[in-house]
Amino acid sequence: MSAKEKFTSLSPAEFFKRNPELAGFPNPARALYQTVRELIENSLDATDVHGILPNIKITIDLIDEARQIYKVNVVDNGIGIPPQEVPNAFGRVLYSSKYANRQTRGMYGLGVKAAVLYSQMHQDKPIEIETSPANSKRIYTFKLKIDINKNEPIIVERGSVENTRGFHGTSVAISIPGDWPKAKSRIYEYIKRTYIITPYAEFIFKDPEGNVTYYPRLTNKIPKPPQEVKPHPYGVDREEIKILINNLKRDYTIKEFLVNEFQSIGDTTADKILELAGLKPNKKVKNLTEEEITRLVETFKKYEDFRSPSADSLSVIGEDLIELGLKKIFNPDFAASITRKPKAYQGHPFIVEAGVAFGGSIPVGEEPIVLRYANKIPLIYDEKSDVIWKVVEELDWKRYGIESDQYQMVVMVHLCSTKIPYKSAGKESIAEVEDIEKEIKNALMEVARKLKQYLSEKRKEQEAKKKLLAYLKYIPEVSRSLATFLASGNKELVSKYQNEISEGLFKLISKKLDLINIEEYRKVYRVDNE
């Protein structure tokens, strides 16, 4: 006879403490990188989403060499956090301000709490927070830990001081075991790639070796922040319907519920849906049975005439900022970008942006440099398992004038959506959703056509150079002979005529060959009349 099984439950905090790799913390190197990433993302969501030009300072210090404990501190000039929310925001797993129906960098209410859990597993220093909401006269300070069994914050210390320096924003410091030598390149790459798509931000990064890197603000143009929108009927299930009903503050009929709580449903559409679902418009929504809720959701899925989800909940980077970032970091000969029109999958709106940079200071490689972004987050790890890489790899670049194994090219793709289909809670690779994959391909093909046009014009210029060089070598001889003939033996006129004829022939050849930059060729192929 077997022993009885013992059943128990785990709090969310206990679950992620036992499975840190699910949140992107499998080892010290990745943990250090992930901590930096989560804190920077929080800082950006506290700034640009609210129309504030970000000023972000990142510091990593080695505070315990024997145990390889690093202190990561990120300071921003964002909106700050209400002091009453700080303990839960940093000490309760799956507690977040990012569950609204709009685009945010964070999704799960997990990120920074996962760093706190990993920190507690290996050392005893609490997380340190300083925050001051806009126009606050106080700066609030906290030292926190997480009660793993209860999934609740433990307030080790709290206080406040007078805000004499007019500070608004948040400073977060976490002590964590790390491996800087292994994480170094990834962290630098993450900050660089973040800067590429946020050229309106200023970053200062001090690493454990004392090196300070400054990323200056290149523009004051900031993307339109995303707006919270109502759910689209395609994107809800039974449980979400029940939550919406339970949270209602008014005693709606079913029809009023559909019209007021969903996008893309007006009076006429509501009548059609209720007729198809066999529901009475005047029935109180809180009296719906389980079976009626099921019928309503099934009707949502079958109805084909909904308008597409609103894109107001999304915030794109924009073509100008993409090209500005690519040009600043890679110094290419050519850069182009495209922002596609909004599409939807499973009721969730999404937009794909793509950019390409070619030539210049970009190194030649067997593969293009691929920059992957989701909701303005650089994706550094798990590159080859991502749908973006899959599309880049499958695209026939030869068709666009790029020779295989000779890629002097950067390819950038950004996916923004109210729901990014990540493969895991670590948020490093995007799943292969058919609608998204198709749109990524369309975006890359569109920007690749711009590259093809540039390369075609460049090859045309190179061919023109060769022809011009061939013609130019005859100009001195032809101009000298014509000048001698026209001067009729007058040596003083020979030089004058020769210069005029040479210049005229040069301009004629340049015009005939349709050269783009005449002055460039005048310098390269200067006619020598001496």
UniProtKB/Swiss-Prot annotation:
Transmembrane segments: none annotated. It comes from the Archaea. It catalyses: ATP-dependent breakage, passage and rejoining of double-stranded DNA. Its EC number is 5.6.2.2. GO terms for biological process: DNA topological change. ATP binds at residues 42, 76, 97-98, 106-113, 427. CDD domains: HATPase_TopVIB-like, TopoIIB_Trans. One of its GO terms (molecular function) is ATP binding. SMART domains: HATPase_c (SM00387). Keywords: ATP-binding, DNA-binding, Isomerase, Nucleotide-binding, Topoisomerase. HAMAP family: Top6B. Relaxes both positive and negative superturns and exhibits a strong decatenase activity. Belongs to the TOP6B family. Homodimer. Heterotetramer of two Top6A and two Top6B chains. This is Type 2 DNA topoisomerase 6 subunit B. It comes from Saccharolobus islandicus (strain Y.N.15.51 / Yellowstone #2). The gene is top6B.
